[in-house]
Regions:
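Terminal helix-turn-helix DNA-binding modules in bacterial transcription factors
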Residues: 67-108, 128-133
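…primarily DNA-binding HTH/wHTH and HhH modules…
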Residues: 113-133
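Residues within helix-turn-helix
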Residues: 48, 59, 95-98, 108-109, ...
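Short hydrophobic/aromatic patch on the recognition helix
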Residues: 61-62, 110-111, 115
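Short, Lys/Arg-enriched, Trp-marked, Pro/Gly-tolerant hinge/linker segments that flank
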Residues: 10-35, 39-53, 67-75, 79
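Residues within the alpha-helical elements of helix-turn-helix
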Residues: 53, 102-103, 118
Length: 133
């Protein structure tokens, strides 16, 4: 499941690599952003962190990503965080608290609310849904 996490990134990157011309500045920024997210999503969920690293504003970063990929910066960050959490929930015996700690959330409650907002169900409900399949 966690490999699905990179499907969107891989699909986008394949599109960039198959283009004969050099990358546009926006495409280069997208590539750098995705690399930064893959390296930092466990501890950095703020758009400002990534925008600062890329020397752009958060608004510009999100607009550029939306134009290039169809997803905003926050969408990409949340996708990485939640897909990693789903992978842990489905393929490890880690507790929800341990996953919350691994992803640097201030509490299990905050993690649960984040997961539910993005995924539409709590981490516990997600794990239980896996055992029904």
């Amino acid at each position: 499941l966690f490999s699905a996490h990179y499907y969107g990134l891989g699909y986008y990157m394949h599109g960039l690599q198959s283009q004969p011309a050099a990358l546009t500045p926006a495409q280069e920024k997208c590539e750098k952003f995705m690399t930064l997210v893959a390296e930092n999503f466990k501890t950095q969920r703020e758009i400002g962190f990534y925008a600062d690293k890329l020397c752009v504003t958060g608004k510009y970063l999100s607009t550029m990503l939306k134009q290039e990929t169809g997803m905003t910066a926050l969408d990409w960050i949340e996708r990485h965080v939640v897909l990693y959490a789903k992978s842990c929930l489905s393929s490890t015996s880690m507790t929800i608290q341990e996953i919350s700690d691994e992803l640097d959330f201030p509490s299990q409650s905050v993690f649960g609310k984040y997961f539910k907002r993005v995924e539409g169900m709590s981490p516990k409900a997600y794990r239980q849904s896996l055992s029904k399949d």
